[in-house]
Amino acid sequence: MVHPVQVGKRTRMSFGKVKDVTEMPNLIEVQLDSYQWFLREGLHEVFDDINPITNFTGNLVLEFVDYKLDMDNIKYSVEECKERDATYAAPLKVSVRLQNNETGEIKEQEVFMGDFPLMTDQGTFIINGAERVIVSQLVRSPGVYYNYSIDKTGKKLYSATVIPNRGAWLEYETDSNDIIYVRIDKTRKLPITILARAMGFGSDQELLDFFGEDERFRASIEKDNTKTREEGLLEIYKRLRPGEPPTVDSAISLIDSLFFDAKRYDLSRVGRYKFNKKLALNLRIANQIAAMDVINPSTGEIMVEKGQKISRLLSEDIQNAGIKSVDILVDDKLVRVISNNFVDITKQVPFDVSDLQIKELVHYPTLKEILDNYSDEATIKEEIKKNLSRLIPKHIIKDDIFATISYELGLPYGIGYVDDIDHLGNRRLRSVGELLQNQFRIGLSRMERVVKERMTIQDQESITPQMLINIRPVAAAIKEFFGSSQLSQFMDQTNPLSELTHKRRLSALGPGGLSRERAGFEVRDVHHSHYGRMCPIETPEGPNIGLINSLATFARVNEYGFIETPYRIIDKENARATEEIRYFTADEEDQCLIAQAKEPLDENGYFVDKKVTVRYLEDVLVVPATDVDLMDVSARQIVSVATAMIPFLENDDASRALMGSNMQRQAVPLLKPQAPIVGTGIEFKAAVDSGVLPKAKNAGVVTFVSANEIRVKRDSDGGTDNYRLLKFKRSNQSSCINQRPIVNKGEIVFKNQVLADGPSTDLGEIALGKNIRMGFITWEGYNYEDAMLISEELVREDVFTSMHIEEYECEARDTKLGPEEITRDIPNVSEDALKDIDDRGIIRIGAEVRSGDILVGKVTPKGETELTAEERLLRAIFGEKAREVRDTSLRVPHGEAGIIVDIKVFTRENGDELNPGVNELVRCYIVQKRKISVGDKMAGRHGNKGVISRILPEEDMPFLPDGRPLQICLNPLGVPSRMNIGQVLEVHLGWAASKLGWHISTPVFDGATENEIEACLEKAGYNANGKTVLYDGRTGEPFDNPVTVGIMYILKLAHLVDDKIHARSTGPYSLVTQQPLGGKAQFGGQRFGEMEVWALEAYGAAHTLQEILTVKSDDVVGRVKTYEAIVKGENIPEPGVPESFKVLIKELQALCLDVKVLNENHQEVSLKEYTDDEIADLEVNIEGSEESTPVVPVVESNIEEVEVEAEDGYREDLDEIEYDENFEIETLETDLELDDFNDEH
């Protein structure tokens, strides 16, 4: 029954029946471990691959000896990097040796190879001040894949693909005449025997002797018109290099460079492992009947007699004895099975080789050669080290190619099996480390080219390693990866859960992955191998569904990049679950029968039932308890962290659970976080691992606590650890990051204890929303279509209030006409508008600002104009002072308001690093306190989302018999059709728990049952059906039927109405079409589209329609006159010719039609070609060019354009700004703001 469990500082009553046998791994270890591997081994591998670099004559040799990341010389700490827009990185120093073989001279030098971005403890990178996450990528593993298609006659045609990590592909295919073809590197197909001949079997007889008699092979030989090895080589050369004169030597070197050159063809460790696994004998000959005696080549003993069935264990011994091929009988047909001849080194070498660190199988002929030639242990070990690249080749070898052909020949007889490409045994993860390694390799190979060039050009006597090495390509490759790769993403920092999920995300998109358009249904679907590895629930809705996934809670990634999941080992004889835990990859698990975590066991671990329900591949079977191999370790093993936080997940429909998982990531951190009354027990682990909470580095005693810092006296040496807390910092998503201490002075803390709460955490548990008293009741139609009716109490008591911090920046640049200046002295601005501006021209902290207020006063020099006599006089009297400047101050944008919380000023004088051409940079932070309001989106944890339709006074809400009013009313119709019954159970259990004063943990798939919930309700003194009589707050009369009332955990989502509401009277227009821009960010208008025009046409509202199509859109002159008329209170004039009409005429002229426009009196109307001509006719100054001030505040086309279609539209302004490569178009748009309307208001 229910039992107390301690989570951090809180006790939860748990309904879980399965006791966890293993700890959940650290949830962000995917990121941390991968990056550590890269620093330890990944960099080494790249340097080893590139070593040595020689020049073309071979007398200069450059070698990378060693490298180190200089951790002591990190320029800025993580915090400083965020503040200064810097990159958190350490210098990479490499010691390089240059050897001159002619003179024997050796020079060694330490070379700086650029700053290398470092990962923070939270698993993120800080690039240009922004926190970024590198998402792991799911790709096809290198290896050999077999497949079949069925032709018209219903015959199976087998095909194969040999995929390396990088290099040429080999593809085999069979046609309906049983001829097997090969394609080399996507070229035209050749009969497979040509490839076999080129690899060394000249005559037909040799081929048949080696591969065995087989009609498909015979058919291929007949199709093949070459008869010797040389002819085969020439034939391949002709296909690969058409038009070049073929010679045998060039053909041999071509094949060598295509397949047998480690620089051009790389299998990678994974590829070699998958090749050996697929092509080994053991899995292919197990349970087959031997056609001949199988004899051990080294001892001469008979391992299997003719006609005997080969068991699984025997097949492994045969494999490791170094036997290359075995003949097998299938339906009285003799089939030869050829392996790639790799063996387990420990079975061949008589002594211990664990110190050589050989983890893969090794090539038997090479090993045999070493063992035959040497006898003593030390020499053999030395030789093995020397020949590692031959024992475990990185490229494909001939034996591999023969084995793949043999596998293809064996498939029709049922020897071997075809592969499922979507199986997680055939897909692997490229995590941060490997993605970085690939980029680094690209950079180094570019650098290698430069080094080789410089070796030939420069003087060989005086040359030094420093002179040869150009670090630019390396630094550029790394920078490009972090800055613009599809897998390097701006961290989703809405709340701790969204951070954690982002770091655990797996994407099948990105370079070398799939593309959205090409990905079919199969790739996106849930696969049985996902169990315990990838969450079947959490994936985005929309075009990326199934391509972006999330790692399951207990999953981890092994050294090859395959995802593993833990299982309990079952002692099969006794049908007893042991305490031993082992991690399995997807293909290892395929042979096993796996029991569920909930399967009842007695106290000694024996199965209670004789028959046990198990999983086997995609089936669910019931088998005797003695047949079970493994057992799940936990009920939440199959889901991701976000999904594991949904209580009663087992009672929700999958598509609603998907929405629930995704919406928890969008919950805004509230002012006063509150942990859920009904939780699942994973909240604490998720918050601790997400990295938003400060944890004690060492055990000790708290000596000092304030809002800003905590000091802990260490037990070990009596020293003090200081922990600074973050106060009101802005997150990537503009939510507020604030940490509050939860320990007291004098408290004893242990290592890794949580010291303070962060955003959306409560006593160290994730707290995304609030526990709300609600009922399922309709109220006057305000719950229609999922809308929510809420009580004013939620607004007044700040229940759903959140803080949002926006950042605005202003930079003073050098222009062609002189430098911009940040100053309080701004032309044409009243003293009242400057009341909160200090003498530097920057607003004071604590000032309350509204839209249009000045944040930073800035003036820009204006072009000198021809001076009039009066101006010359003024200039003579006042000197330089009357120089013309333009007001380009930073103002609060439309619809924004708040309080200034922080100002940061960076200047050249203070030694801050600024972009070229920038002299001063000011950042203002404005905080807003947003109460819940109509139009905000809220949601429960079960995918039950809705928009607030009305805020009702507390006294009008329905109330309980004890007088407490409800806080939210939800529509009962939202439940049955959506099948998310979990929300109802949550409400019942929450109702009971709030009365009993409990916090509850009900783990997914192992939570409270219906009977337990009823028992809790009765214990709390409520009706067992969970319903209550409710009274109408307006009349005081009871409603007709009892209503389900309880506590539901409700989140406020990041889709806030304040960010979406938007209105415009006039504003910027597009350069080309002269129509208003679109969207809130551009201060655009609402598009009146085709269908809306039809609606007005249908009503016959001609004048409204004319107005919308002309003066409200692109009639340039008409809209100015209309504005003027409105201001002066006159009648609105006739519309003119819209710009789009002129475009239409130009289109017709382009078709060589002469178009004239006539008015109603059949007189020709002259169209002005250019807007400038029309402006000349107006008395007003549209552009706001400063020579004469306009009579009325007139609005005209700004050059603030988002899709800048006209190239030259913004070129002139670009000249003023010194170009640099980090410059982004967003900053450009703010520079081009010439909007008189905004300036006036």
Curated annotation (Swiss-Prot):
**Matches recorded under InterPro entries:** DNA-dir_RNA_pol_bsu_ext_1_sf, DNA-dir_RNA_pol_bsu_external_1, DNA-dir_RNA_pol_su2, DNA-dir_RNAP_su2_dom, DNA-dir_RNAP_su2_hyb_sf, RNA_pol_bsu_bac, RNA_pol_bsu_CS, RNA_pol_bsu_protrusion
Give the reaction(s) catalysed: RNA(n) + a ribonucleoside 5'-triphosphate = RNA(n+1) + diphosphate
Top-level class of the enzyme under EC nomenclature: transferase
User: What PROSITE patterns does the database record attribute to this sequence?
Assistant: RNA_POL_BETA (PS01166)
The protein's UniProt keywords, in alphabetical order, are: DNA-directed RNA polymerase, Nucleotidyltransferase, Transcription, Transferase
On the tree of life, the source organism's domain of life is Bacteria
Name the GO cellular-component terms.
DNA-directed RNA polymerase complex
Q: What is its EC number?
A: 2.7.7.6
GO MF terms listed in the record are: DNA binding; DNA-directed RNA polymerase activity; ribonucleoside binding
Annotated GO biological processes are: DNA-templated transcription
Q: How does it assemble?
A: The RNAP catalytic core consists of 2 alpha, 1 beta, 1 beta' and 1 omega subunit. When a sigma factor is associated with the core the holoenzyme is formed, which can initiate transcription.
Q: What does this protein do?
A: DNA-dependent RNA polymerase catalyzes the transcription of DNA into RNA using the four ribonucleoside triphosphates as substrates.
The family database entries (NCBIfam families) matched by this protein are listed as: PRK00405.1, rpoB
Give the family this protein belongs to, as stated in its UniProt record. Belongs to the RNA polymerase beta chain family.
What name does UniProt use for this protein? DNA-directed RNA polymerase subunit beta
